Amino acid sequence: PKLIGDPRQPAPLAINATFEVLGHAFRLDGPVLYATTDPVRGERLREVLVFPPATVTPARDAAMSVNGKPAPVVLRVRAGRDGVKGSVTLPVPAGWRVDPAAVPVELAKAGDETTARFAVTPPSGAAAASLRPAIDVDGKAWSFREHVIDYPHIPVQVVLQPAQVRVVPLQ
């Protein structure tokens, strides 16, 4: 709520520097940035990000199970660092079924991607449910989705949010 009205999230890493020139103190505050050069767009500035080992972003925000048939849930798994080995899971409420129970993933480089596919079957008469996909890396579960906002006229922004997919049974 305290970020409402702000055009962007605060920088995850910031620097504070104090200088003294001719007896006057100056303080500079700002985000930690790095620059890359694109052959078409020229210099591009990006914030240094604090990132989880991997993200699990649903291909769609909702999936439908029609007449008791499994609802397909597709997740894009992206490495946030080199050498990610883990297992993607999709926990479901009691009485629901998910196949497979887990999808092993191995991503060599930061930025590498793969897809994890699940089939979710709700029990008869079940109401819609929000599921939280997660990836277990080094014994810790991470459940973040990633959205990259990249337009030529603004700095690249990466938004991390809790990963969630809604499964809706239809009769």
Language model regions located:
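Long beta-sheet-rich domains in secretory-pathway and surface-associated proteins
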Residues: 1-170
